């Protein structure tokens, strides 16, 4: 009798000895165990090294075209409006230039925005907005001009 069959018999005999019904059909099924040698095809190794999905905690560029997405533009408007109310400023959003994101109990959005200053000059700012959409929560974390960045 093979070792795997002995294992199956001992499991079912022990179960029967414990007062449970014995399943004769399963006792006859040999148990096969597969052991991995840790080796695989080169394609499997390469696939294992490829990043999957979003890295939690890492800041990454948003997919192309996200700058014109309605949700992103609304976040940028929110950031400019919050900054204006806190700093008593009169900036106007012109466009979203770049979007980066970070997963942190929601999303931290890093928005590079072009704004028009009261004098008429356009300038680039970096806005950092924390959003938890499922709670309808968003908060401006930071809003600062990019050094020597005139659009």
UniProtKB/Swiss-Prot annotation:
InterPro entries: Cystatin, Cystatin_dom, Cystatin_sf, Prot_inh_cystat_CS
Site (described: Reactive site): 57
Any single Pfam family the record assigns to this protein: SQAPI
Entry's Gene Ontology molecular function annotations: cysteine-type endopeptidase inhibitor activity
Record motif Secondary area of contact, residues: 102-106
Function, as annotated: There are two distinct cystatins in rice seeds (Oryzacystatin-1 and -2) with different specificities against cysteine proteinases. May be involved in the control of germination by inhibition of endogenous cysteine proteinases. May play a role in defense by inhibiting exogenous proteases such as those present in digestive tracks of insects and nematodes.
Protein name: Cysteine proteinase inhibitor 2
Domain (Cystatin): residue spans on this chain: 57-147
GO biological process per UniProt: defense response
Alphabetical list of Gene3D superfamilies matching this protein: 3.10.450.10
UniProt xrefs under SMART domains: CY
PANTHER family: CYSTATIN FAMILY MEMBER, CYSTEINE PROTEINASE INHIBITOR 2
Organism for this UniProt entry: Oryza sativa subsp. japonica
């Amino acid at each position: 009798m093979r070792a795997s069959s002995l294992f199956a018999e001992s499991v079912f005999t022990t179960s029967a000895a414990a007062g449970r019904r014995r399943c004769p059909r399963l006792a006859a099924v040999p148990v096969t165990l597969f052991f991995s040698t840790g080796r695989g095809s080169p394609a499997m190794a390469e696939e294992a090294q490829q990043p999957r999905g979003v890295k939690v905690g890492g800041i990454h560029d948003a997919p192309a075209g996200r700058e014109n997405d309605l949700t992103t533009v609304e976040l940028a408007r929110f950031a400019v409006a919050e900054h204006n109310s806190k700093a008593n400023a009169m900036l106007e959003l012109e466009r979203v230039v770049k979007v980066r994101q970070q997963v942190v109990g929601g999303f931290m959005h890093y928005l590079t925005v072009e704004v028009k200053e009261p004098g008429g000059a356009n300038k680039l700012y970096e806005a950092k907005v924390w959003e938890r959409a499922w709670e309808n929560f968003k908060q401006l974390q930071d809003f600062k001009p990019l050094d020597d960045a005139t659009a």
